[in-house]
């Protein structure tokens, strides 16, 4: 995880769980199986992280979602999960993103999609929102096209679900829940195990694949057949079979 053992010299190769760790394997003369590259990892990053935002907000005493206006910055893995759960809980969803980045399925769950460069529309949405949450992974993304003062004056509860400060220096840490730290980190279980077990199964599968034969050096992505086999097990025996269509 996060290339924690990248400096070691394995006799067979590495299995890496996270995208953030991949760059540290550059130049390694061995195979690196990247579990993060497949569909299965979306169960954790999309569904698991999306669910955890609402669980964290409930822990803080904000659990009434029906009809609430939420502005979500980003429509990648984490953003898509937030959009999915916001829609399921009855929120009116506005997403700020690059239009080319949002899938048709995710777009269908949104009331409004705003181009990330449209500062006027972003300002209006943030000014009237009940909730604002960032999930772009880009420092300062929220204030790139919208003045920081708009967020400071808004009545919305501001939160961040990325590791970067996506609000920028113009929005004080005290204005954002948990001082801009990823909100789900307040939870005892930031991501529930039911959203992680398939990823761990794929991680273990990677070790079996590397051990079963000579693999070429470089990054190796999970093959479709392996992922579909594990997903079939999840659908049959898991507790989130009704959610898997969202990945």
Model-identified regions with their sequence ranges:
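A short, aliphatic-rich alpha-helical micro-motif
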Residues: 65, 123-127, 151
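Short acidic low-complexity segments
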Residues: 109-128
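NAD(P)-binding Rossmann-fold cofactor-contacting core
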Residues: 73, 88-109
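ADP-ribose/adenylate-binding Rossmann-like module
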Residues: 1, 7-20, 131-177, 197
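Adenosine-phosphate binding glycine-rich loop
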Residues: 33-67, 157-247
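Glycine-rich adenosine-cofactor-binding loop
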Residues: 63-87, 97
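Phosphate/diphosphate ligand-binding glycine-rich loop within oxidoreductases
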Residues: 1-47
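Short glycine/serine/threonine-rich phosphate/pyrophosphate-binding segments
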Residues: 78-82, 103, 139-144
